[in-house]
Curated annotation (Swiss-Prot):
<keyword id="KW-0813">Transport</keyword>
<feature type="topological domain" description="Cytoplasmic">
    <location>
        <begin position="772"/>
        <end position="780"/>
    </location>
</feature>
<dbReference type="InterPro" id="IPR052430">
    <property type="entry name" value="IVT-Associated"/>
</dbReference>
<feature type="transmembrane region" description="Helical">
    <location>
        <begin position="707"/>
        <end position="727"/>
    </location>
</feature>
<feature type="transmembrane region" description="Helical">
    <location>
        <begin position="844"/>
        <end position="864"/>
    </location>
</feature>
<feature type="compositionally biased region" description="Basic and acidic residues">
    <location>
        <begin position="1"/>
        <end position="10"/>
    </location>
</feature>
<feature type="transmembrane region" description="Helical">
    <location>
        <begin position="255"/>
        <end position="275"/>
    </location>
</feature>
<dbReference type="GO" id="GO:0015031">
    <property type="term" value="P:protein transport"/>
</dbReference>
<dbReference type="GO" id="GO:0016020">
    <property type="term" value="C:membrane"/>
</dbReference>
<comment type="similarity">
    <text>Belongs to the BRE4 family.</text>
</comment>
<feature type="topological domain" description="Extracellular">
    <location>
        <begin position="165"/>
        <end position="176"/>
    </location>
</feature>
<feature type="topological domain" description="Extracellular">
    <location>
        <begin position="728"/>
        <end position="750"/>
    </location>
</feature>
<comment type="function">
    <text>May be involved in intracellular vesicle transport.</text>
</comment>
<feature type="transmembrane region" description="Helical">
    <location>
        <begin position="144"/>
        <end position="164"/>
    </location>
</feature>
<feature type="region of interest" description="Disordered">
    <location>
        <begin position="426"/>
        <end position="449"/>
    </location>
</feature>
<dbReference type="Pfam" id="PF10334">
    <property type="entry name" value="BRE4"/>
</dbReference>
<feature type="transmembrane region" description="Helical">
    <location>
        <begin position="781"/>
        <end position="801"/>
    </location>
</feature>
Length: 1125
């Protein structure tokens, strides 16, 4: 990179190109300190928050550098002044650098640790896999009893209909077993809306498949030449149909049941019969398949509607209640005498709260709006309640854990005072027993007058903490208790909304909410009064902000108050929710582009890929919100591209007209996000062709080709004259059909899962043979009894333990083996020992072939590896974190003057943070899948990825904290003067750009599987340099301020101000507001205090990000390796 050296001559040559970055450089301003001992000329007479920020941050950065023993690489006095470039601070590699064999050493060490902890892991596995399911079995049965009964009754009725010979013969003859197969695929343990949509989609898909097959049958026997080679026509028809169905199911998951029914009908009708002429066609099989499959769909729908129906309303309200409960648990942990010293327990409660709201509630709400529901609540009111809960949780998410505002002794004393006060008043006691309100909590004016005398041995830190405790501890304690009571009342009100006699409870709910609203606002007001009293007291000073623990207490107070204010909004939204309660049919309202790629939770589990699909969905959502952020103009300033171009051209001229235009320059954004747009060309057709080529070469098409090839290979014997007889006689076409039903493109699995699925299939085959082989060969009563015995354990395995595919395999195999000989017309031969055995082992072998191929197909030819996806996911996650950091730095920290974040900016920030949280959780689920993959070639250490994910989660929390604090202060107002701002521009650019650049490099290394470069910019050193010069400017300002005040001549001060203003105006730059001594008392001290507190919090968060990024870099080097010379 070309760089420019600072000109050291006294009269620089004006012809030397300095680059487009034409501001005064840092080094030239640094020389002014030696040329002018008074420092920089422009001064501010009011105290600046830069002193607190610089002192805290610089001390921490100095300690970090000292602990790491970094040695900075010499920059030889060069400085970068061009736009688009920055000066990176590099440090020499650690003397304990990784050797080329370090990966081998790490792997050997990991292997030794794994061997040493083998017994511990074995005991944990035994506990997880055996003892815990046994202990929790009664609870799981009670919780899922209704679902198990619905699954059981639907399947049992289907078997009973099939074994009754008149009904079974009318429904499907020897293919009647498609009735229970359809029940298994479309089981009734779903919401009514989902079941109805699934039924309609499957009916349309099966009808379309039968129509396609009828056309293929007609064409294949229309003439004698085609009838002689009917297999070729059916082969072509099946290939086209499978290509269409598999690709559509892979791209748009909403068509899962449509394509499944379509494919089943296509595979069945293309392999079940081979005719030599149109007179040999047996169209009866269309009836046999269509009616049995239709009755299975209708039976599942009937059981879903009649037996304990679920409309989706109760599940969503359960998510809301759970969210309120976890928030209450977190607040209770803050004032728990036993947990006050356990930061880990409080942190776990905080993480659970975030997960419940950002993941569980969000997932439940999406499922609710993505399906047909019969709801009692207005959708817009539910959405407002969810958004207000999210806003409340945002402040609690960054709440400092276990600050020194409380200790266990003080909490016990507060609880004793509370109980004593309640016991003294019988009236208040009755009210408290009737409704757990906080009206009995004693309050007093918590002013510093209650502050205890300070002993001579106390440190400054202890003095500050004691002063803050005396002022705020009881008010904060009362506010937390009140928030807990309010959350409990909200949970009670939501339960009353669901009760049948809701109209009678509505007045009571309004009374509870109104009382909670007034009490909470009163506690917030009392906390505000305590704060104002403290600000006006003698204990309030600038030195408080130089203590980190005091800043934590202020942030705790601020974030808690913000969350309490948001809780007031939650109360209002809950009250609005109860004003419009009546039964209504809510159609799906989810955006179509996203609805086509989503399925309800139970349907996703039925697919068999577990939570892996959640990762791809979350990744699409994150990409979508970043695309919206980068292509939406959120500035308060107007932006006109045409006028900007005209101004740029006119600026090249020197006439009077162009000068007038420059005087009326419009305000534009400092950074234009169009560079981040995915559309890199102005030609729309070129972009569309690129998208088409991506689709044709994507994973969906590769999977389609692979599955179609395997299906055609398994179907091939049915079209050959030498093999079609035995293939159709023993229903061997169940091999391709089983393979199609069990294969999934996002399921890698391992040999243990293959064996588990195979064992379940063998159990089903054996049980079906036993049902027919028992006394009175093929007795309908025995078959029904065996069906009832096998469906109970596998329904529990299906619904409780989420082993959906293995349970489906067992029940499908039992259904086919039990009903195939029972349904054949020649009962005298088929229902004998020889007939039952031959039918069992031949058809069972076909089923086993389909089962064995269903999982290893993902291991060969364009395989799906969760480990590869995990590496790609880390690349995307690091890129998204880097872009989030850049967005916070651009739109919050270094925003233009008078360009505060808008409501749209805040909305995008909330959506981005929630979706990144969901993406992190989805990556953790992907890591669980990667742990169970078979190790073939590469070594994989999941603990390294787990450490990297934890570091990324910490980075996200700090980015959120910085975003919240960045909205409350302007960085330009904290500078001493405009020349300080110009001098620090390059250092601020270097500090932020170093972090973004490291994110970019790490992301690309994960995507390309390259090793991490040995030399990367050190953000900590860049940030240390920034605060070093901020401290220097602060010292220069203090020195100049003391020299100016020592003169005692007001005329000299006014003259200095005039000189400064004249200098600023002559330089052609806009002057920053310079507060005078006369009007400095008019500045709102409270606003300035919180501005400074948030500035310190922001600086600390960015310092934490720089430090955590070094840990991320170390984890990345452990995973990918490090380049060596």
């Amino acid at each position: 990179m070309k760089r420019y050296e600072r000109d050291r001559s006294p009269t620089p040559d004006p012809d030397i190109v300095k680059g487009s970055y034409s501001q005064t450089s840092l080094r030239s301003l640094h020389e002014l300190n030696y040329k002018n001992p008074a420092g920089i000329s422009g001064l501010s007479f009011a105290g600046s928050p830069q002193q607190s920020v610089a002192s805290l941050s610089q001390m921490r950065l100095e300690n970090l550098v000292k602990d790491k023993h970094w040695e900075e690489v010499e920059d030889f006095g060069l400085e970068e002044l061009r736009d688009g470039f920055f000066d990176a601070a590099f440090t020499k590699p650690d003397s304990k650098a990784r050797s080329p064999n370090s990966d081998i050493d790490d792997d050997n060490g990991a292997a030794r640790k794994k061997l040493q902890s083998g017994f511990t892991k074995l005991s944990e596995y035994v506990w997880t896999a055996i003892y815990r399911p046994i202990i929790h079995f009664p609870r799981d049965i009670r919780k899922n009893g209704v679902s198990i009964f619905k699954f059981f009754i639907a399947y049992f009725i289907a078997i009973v209909i099939c074994v009754i010979r008149p009904s079974g013969r009318w429904i499907g003859h020897e293919f009647r077993y498609f009735l229970p197969i359809a029940v298994l695929i479309h089981h009734p343990v779903r919401n009514i809306g989902v079941q109805l949509e699934m039924t309609i989609s499957s009916i349309i898909g099966a009808s379309f498949g039968l129509g396609w097959s009828a056309l293929a049958w007609y064409i294949s026997t229309a003439t004698k030449p085609t009838a002689n080679y009917q297999g070729g026509i059916l082969f072509q028809s099946l290939t086209m149909a499978l290509l269409f169905a598999i690709w559509l199911r892979s791209v748009y998951r909403r068509f899962f049941y449509f394509t499944t029914s379509f494919s089943i009908s296509i595979i069945f009708t293309h392999t079940v019969r081979l005719a030599s002429s149109k007179f040999d066609l047996k169209w009866q099989i269309f009836w046999d398949f269509g009616i049995s499959y239709l009755f299975g769909l209708l039976l599942s729908l009937l059981v879903c509607v009649c037996v304990s129906p679920h409309s989706g309303n109760a599940e969503l309200m359960e998510h809301y209640n759970k969210c309120l409960q976890t928030t209450k648990t977190f607040l209770m942990a803050l004032v728990d005498t036993e947990l006050i010293k356990s930061k880990e327990q409080i942190y776990l409660a905080q993480v659970k709260m975030v997960k419940t709201l950002n993941i569980d509630l969000s997932q439940g709400f999406r499922d609710f709006v993505n399906q047909l529901t019969i709801s009692r609540f207005d959708l817009q009111s539910l959405k407002s309640l969810r958004n207000s809960l999210t806003a409340m949780e945002t402040s609690l998410r960054v709440l400092p854990i276990a600050p020194k505002i409380f200790n266990d002794d003080e909490l016990k004393k507060m609880y004793e005072e509370l109980e004593k006060y309640r016991s003294d008043s019988a009236t208040l006691s009755k009210e408290a027993s009737a409704s757990p309100q906080s009206s009995g909590i004693p309050t007093r004016e918590n002013t510093p007058s209650a502050f205890k005398p300070i002993g001579p041995g106390l440190l400054k830190n202890e003095i500050y903490i004691n002063a803050l405790k005396a002022s705020f501890s009881k008010s904060i304690f009362n506010l937390i208790l009140e928030m807990i009571f309010v959350l409990e009342n909200l949970s009670r009100v939501l339960k009353k909304y669901e009760s049948p006699n809701q109209k009678n409870n509505l007045d009571e709910c309004v009374k509870i909410l109104s009382h909670s609203h007034s009490k909470l606002k009163r506690k917030i007001y009392k906390l505000d009064v305590c704060y104002r009293d403290f600000v006006n007291s003698s204990f309030f000073s600038q030195e408080l902000l130089n203590d980190e623990e005091s800043v934590d207490i202020f942030l705790f107070l601020r974030y808690l108050r913000n969350s309490a204010r948001q809780l007031v909004t939650v109360i209002h939204d809950c009250q609005v929710l109860g004003e419009n309660i009546h039964w209504r049919i809510a159609l799906p309202s989810y955006p179509l582009s996203r609805a086509l790629t989503r399925l309800p939770k139970q349907c996703v589990l039925d697919e068999g890929a577990g939570n892996v699909l959640h990762y791809f969905e979350a990744k699409r959502d994150v990409d979508e919100i970043f695309e919206r952020v980068y292509n939406t103009y959120t500035s308060r300033h107007k932006y006109n591209k045409g006028e900007e171009e005209a101004l740029r051209l006119d600026s090249q001229g020197g006439d009077e007209k162009s000068q007038n235009r420059k005087n009326h320059t419009i305000s534009i954004r400092a950074i234009d996000h169009n560079d981040f747009n995915f559309h890199t060309t102005q030609n729309p057709w070129r972009f569309k062709l690129w998208k088409l080529s991506r689709i044709l070469s994507g994973d969906e098409c590769k999977w389609t080709l692979k599955i179609t090839f395997c299906m055609i290979f398994l179907c091939l014997p049915t079209w050959l004259p030498e093999s079609y007889h035995w293939y159709q006689e023993f229903h061997c076409w169940w091999a391709p059909l089983t393979f199609y039903l069990l294969a999934h493109r996002r399921y890698s699995g391992n040999w243990a899962l293959v064996m588990r699925r195979l064992i379940c299939g063998i159990v089903g085959i054996f049980w079906g043979w036993a049902a027919n082989q028992s006394r009175h060969f093929g007795s309908p009563y025995v078959v029904c009894t065996f069906a009832g015995l096998i469906v109970v354990p596998f329904s529990i395995n299906f619904l409780v333990y989420r082993n959906t595919k293995s349970s489906f395999t067992a029940l499908m195999c039992f259904t086919i083996i039990a009903l195939e000989p029972y349904s054949k017309p020649n009962r005298h031969y088929n229902l004998t020992t020889a007939g039952i055995w031959k039918s069992t082992w031949v058809t069972g072998l076909a089923l086993i072939i389909g089962i064995l191929v269903s999982i290893p197909i993902n291991w060969i030819v364009w395989p799906f590896r969760a480990r590869t996806e995990l590496r790609d996911s880390m690349s995307s996650l690091l890129a998204h974190l880097g872009q989030s950091y850049q967005t916070v730095a651009d739109r919050y920290l270094y925003r233009d003057a008078d360009d505060a974040p808008t409501d749209l900016t805040f909305a995008f920030s909330h959506i981005r943070e929630v979706r990144l949280t969901q993406s992190l959780e989805a990556i953790r689920e992907l890591l669980k899948k990667a742990r169970h993959e078979p190790i073939i070639i590469s070594n994989f250490n999941p603990e390294k990825y787990a450490s990297l994910i934890n570091s990324c989660q910490f980075l996200l929390s700090k980015i959120i904290e910085a975003r919240i604090s960045g909205a409350f202060f302007e960085i330009w107002d904290q500078d001493f003067d405009i020349e300080t701002t110009r001098a620090l521009l390059s250092l601020r650019r270097d500090s932020v750009s170093s972090v973004i650049f490291v994110f970019y490099i790490l992301s690309n290394c994960f995507r390309s599987k390259n090793k991490i470069p040995r030399y990367l910019p050190n953000p900590i050193m860049s940030r240390k340099k920034l605060y070093h010069f901020i401290k220097k400017f602060s010292e220069m300002k203090d020195q100049s301020h003391s020299n100016l005040n020592s003169g005692g001549n007001s005329m000299e001060k006014n003259l200095f101000k005039k000189i400064y203003q004249q200098k600023a105006s002559s330089s052609g730059q806009q002057q920053l507001p310079l507060p005078s001594v006369a009007n400095s008392s008019e500045i709102d001290s409270e606003k300035m205090h919180w501005t400074e507190v948030h500035g310190i919090a922001f600086a600390r968060a960015f310092t934490d990000i720089s430090e955590a990024l070094f840990q991320v870099e170390s984890c990345a080097k452990d995973i990918l390796g490090e380049e060596n010379f």
